[in-house]
From Swiss-Prot:
GO terms for cellular component: cell envelope Sec protein transport complex; cytosol; plasma membrane. It is found in: Cell membrane; Cytoplasm. It comes from Clostridium botulinum (strain Eklund 17B / Type B). PANTHER family: CHLOROPLAST PROTEIN-TRANSPORTING ATPASE (PTHR30612:SF0), SECA INNER MEMBRANE COMPONENT OF SEC PROTEIN SECRETION SYSTEM (PTHR30612). The gene is secA. SMART domains: SecA_DEAD (SM00957), SecA_PP_bind (SM00958). Its EC number is 7.4.2.8. ATP binds at Q85, G103, E104, G105, K106, T107, D492. GO terms for biological process: intracellular protein transmembrane transport; protein import; protein targeting; protein transport by the Sec complex. This is Protein translocase subunit SecA. Keywords: ATP-binding, Cell membrane, Cytoplasm, Membrane, Metal-binding, Nucleotide-binding, Protein transport, Translocase, Translocation, Transport, Zinc. The keyword ATP-binding applies. GO terms for molecular function: ATP binding; metal ion binding; protein-exporting ATPase activity. The keyword tRNA-binding does not apply. Zn(2+) binds at C820, C822, C831, C832.
């Protein structure tokens, strides 16, 4: 702790001091609330709503509202919020992150700001890490909200649109980050405003906020349709990279988890694929296939990053060790792994809509979160999300003993020592929770314990209900539980009878995670609410963290000591070195996330423009004005492009202009060419615009005004959707190749921003042109109806750029030879099927 902190207290301590007077006000109301009957307590909700309508703010009524929730909770749930929980509730209401240790009752804390903000009628979203916790919390806390007259909803995967809409219209809605994010994307793909399910994003409380806003931050949610690219390219690229020689043709940067071709590798690629310059922008697609094949073969490890089960490649969650069935790496990485493992390669999908959690959660009016471990990432929360981290004091002091790390020379010696330590604790009945970094390590320790005859359970659950059940019993006497570091998060481990007397729950970490936060979470499973407990990390010089990031000095010290395989050292120097290695990785990961946010912000701004335009089309009764503006823009651009006053053949320029506009919006026979040649540019634009408007008015006479207004909306929505989907794909391709600009001393993010903006402008022009063309050529007998441009086939997490990305969903409704539903009379494959 620095000198200033020692004198003035930490930032959190000073902020908590400021909050304590509000807590005193709540406590002063305790006796008043106790005297109220149930009906009088319930009536407070109506009173608060009236006061808010009359101009008071939620801050004005906070002490009373919190006091009401506290008393209602005591009556309904038999749980009364203590002072530290009130502090946590105030921190959340203020739009900050409350760091609260395991067992401090975060679920109950959330009821305070949820009730207070629910009184506004604008909706409160409480985000949990899985469906099981969402259902559990909504059911338990829903009793409390219901008693006070507020409604509770829960969003889980299997709900219909009607059920989702009802849940979102509740005062307080529980659900997972995935479900909320996908619903946002789907709402921006609907063709009738009545199909939307979400309201405006008002206030959210994110449970396990570090997991969602940091660990999952780079993971985009992707709604996808069926792609058209052949899977053969993946096989060819896979065959090519398997012929490469390490260090000669490619190098691996383990710190960045990247594989790169050397100059020799570039030359080999040019020879194999018969291209002149592999790094050329025109070879961006080839680079994409080769890059993903390199990563699949030399960076992704079977049984660590993914498993092959029944002919399918299944992702292993790097934080929980769970199999993530149904989730696919995006960007073709999953297909590259399928080629590597020689299993059936699924067709690459086409992205229809996508957003990262970083950008989804930044759209809320007020964002808050709670977790047991956030302080180590305080800078990132502040810089990316504008969130403060406030450490809330524990209700009882933490008495858990955190032992120094034990460092072993080899992995084998370390695992033997871990098993011996477990057996010793088991002999006296002390419960043990063993944290591993992978399923593979869990199974190795399990097999060694079996040989020793130590009964144990391995937490490798696919079902969160089962996982929660196992974790609940992990604190009972004699219980040994092996789990990946983050498994069972959100479920308390309560100590069984007689366990306190023998030292409480013993935590054994079998490896340091690259993030200190994950290690702290594992430690925090023990010592809840002032219970005794202890934690120790067992480390070997062969662990990934030590091998890749640890200093050579440490390796030298251990070698000099001449340790036996099962001997360990405890050293402050080693512990400091490990912490420095972790800080290095955390800093590196933060930089990656910041860089990716630079890319993603470009798409985010563009997404906002498109979704805003879509919403206006859906909401608006009349988009005719917008169509006429587009018509003028199309004509103006055409005149600027074709009519150059210094042109050698002025008349020929006009002929090209008239021919171009004839295809879009003005019949040739309507234009007086000789008269045009005598006009200025502005006069030409005005004249052609008048001709086009006259033509459009004739079109209106063929239809009723009401019918044409609907057709305008249909055509505009279709143009926006098809062009936006193509644009997403083009931006993906741009991002794939942009990294090579660094070789030309160009900042890739800056280049992406500039070129992406130019592409966006082109897309907007293309939307205008397409919309105008379709409307000026529409026929009564072929008037288009509202149909989705593409049908969702999948919603998945794509792949983190340079790790796994996020979720995806799919679109395929019409046969390729069916008549296109848009009314053109063409076959689907020759019409909208090209876009879908």
């Amino acid at each position: 702790m620095g000198l200033l902190s020692a004198v003035f207290g930490t930032y959190s301590e000073r902020e908590v001091k400021r909050i304590r007077p509000i807590v005193s006000k709540i406590n002063e109301l305790d006796e008043v609330m106790q005297k109220l009957s149930d009906d009088e307590l319930k009536a407070k909700t109506v009173e608060f709503k009236e006061r808010l309508n009359n101009g008071e703010t939620v801050d004005d009524i906070l002490p009373e509202a919190f006091a009401v929730v506290r008393e209602a909770s005591k009556r309904v749930l038999n749980m009364k919020h203590y002072d530290e929980q009130l502090i946590g509730g105030i921190v959340l209401h203020q739009g900050r992150i409350a760091e609260m240790k395991t067992g401090e009752g975060k679920t109950l804390v959330a009821t305070l700001p949820a009730y207070l903000n629910g009184l506004t009628g604008k909706g409160v979203h409480i985000i949990t890490v899985n469906d099981y916790l969402a259902k559990r919390d909504a059911e338990q806390m829903g009793e409390l909200y219901g008693f006070l007259g507020l409604t509770t909803g829960v969003i889980v995967h299997e709900l219909t649109n009607e059920q989702r809409r009802e849940a979102y219209n509740s005062d307080i809605t529980y659900g997972t980050n995935n479900e909320f994010g996908f619903d946002y994307l789907r709402d921006n793909m609907v063709i009738y405003k009545e199909e939307r399910v979400q309201r405006k994003l008002n206030f959210t409380i994110v449970d396990e906020v570090d997991s969602i806003l940091i660990d999952e931050a780079r993971t985009p949610l992707i709604i996808s349709g069926q792609g058209e690219k052949s899977t053969e390219f993946y096989k060819v690229a896979d065959y090519f990279v398997k012929t490469l020689v390490k260090e000669k043709d490619y190098t691996i940067d383990e710190k960045a988890n990247a594989v790169m071709l050397t100059d020799e590798g570039f030359h080999k690629a040019e020879q194999t694929f018969k291209v002149e310059n592999y790094a050329d922008a025109e070879n961006v697609e080839l680079q994409h296939y080769v890059t993903q094949a390199l990563k699949a073969n030399y960076a992704m490890r079977r049984d660590k990053d993914y498993m092959v089960k029944d002919g399918e490649v299944i992702i292993v969650d790097e934080f929980t060790g769970r199999l993530m069935e149904g989730r696919r790496y995006s960007d073709g990485l999953h297909q590259a792994i399928e080629a590597k493992e020689n299993v059936k390669i699924a067709r690459e999908s086409k992205t229809l809509a996508t957003i990262t959690f970083q950008n989804y959660f930044r759209m809320y009016e007020k964002l808050s979160g709670m977790t047991g471990t956030a302080l180590t990432e305080e800078n990132e929360f502040r810089e990316i999300y504008g969130l403060d981290v406030i450490v809330v004091p524990t209700h009882k002091p933490v008495v858990r003993i955190d032992n120094p790390d034990l460092v072993f020379k080899s992995e084998k010696g370390k695992i033997m020592a871990v098993v011996d330590e477990i057996a010793k604790a088991h002999e006296v009945g002390q419960p043990v929770l063993v944290g591993t970094v992978s399923i593979e390590k869990s199974e190795l320790i399990s097999s060694m314990l079996k040989k020793k005859g130590v009964p144990h359970q391995v937490l490798n659950a696919k079902f969160h209900e089962q996982e929660a059940e196992i974790i609940t019993h992990a604190g009972e006497k004699g219980m040994v539980t092996i789990a990946t570091n983050m498994a069972g998060r959100g479920t308390d481990i309560k100590l069984g009878e007689g366990v306190l007397e023998i030292g409480g729950l013993k935590i054994i970490g079998t490896e340091r995670h690259e993030s200190r936060r994950i290690d702290n979470q594992l430690r925090g499973r023990s010592g809840r609410q002032g219970d005794s407990g202890e934690s120790t990390f067992f480390i070997s010089l062969e662990d990934d963290l030590m091998r890749i990031f640890g200093s050579e000095k440490i390796q030298g010290v251990v070698e000099k000591l001449g340790l036996e395989e099962d001997e360990a050292i405890e050293s402050k120097l080693v512990s400091k070195s490990i912490e420095n290695a972790q800080k290095k990785v955390e800093g590196n990961n933060f930089d990656i996330r910041k860089t990716l946010l630079g890319y993603d912000d470009v798409m985010n701004k563009q997404r906002e423009v498109i979704y805003k335009q879509r919403a206006e089309v859906l909401e608006g009764e009349d988009v005719k004005e917008e169509i006429l503006h587009m018509l003028r823009d199309v004509i103006s651009d055409a005149v600027d492009t074709h009519i150059k006053e210094d042109a050698e053949d002025y008349r020929e320029s006009f002929l090209y202009l008239i021919s171009y506009l004839n295809d879009i919006c003005i019949p040739t026979n309507e234009v007086n060419l000789p008269a045009l040649t005598e006009m200025s540019k502005e006069e030409i634009i005005d004249h052609l615009y008048d001709v086009a408007v006259k033509s459009y008015e004739d079109k209106e006479a063929e239809f009723t005004s009401e019918r044409l207004r609907e057709i305008e909306r249909v055509v505009l929505l279709r143009s926006v959707d098809t062009k936006w989907m193509d644009h997403i794909n083009n931006m993906d391709n741009l991002k794939q190749g942009i990294g090579l600009r660094a070789f030309k001393q160009v900042d890739p993010v800056q280049a992406y921003q500039m070129e992406g903006s130019a592409m966006f402008e082109e897309m907007i022009d293309s939307i205008k042109k397409e919309t105008v063309k379709m409307l000026l050529h529409v026929k009564v007998e072929r008037a288009p109806e509202r149909v989705r441009v593409a049908q969702e086939t999948n919603a998945v997490h794509g792949d983190k750029p340079s790790a796994p990305v996020g979720p995806v969903r799919n679109l395929n409704k019409f046969g390729r030879n069916d008549v296109c539903p848009c009314g053109s009379g063409k076959k689907f494959k020759n019409c909208c099927g090209r876009e879908a």
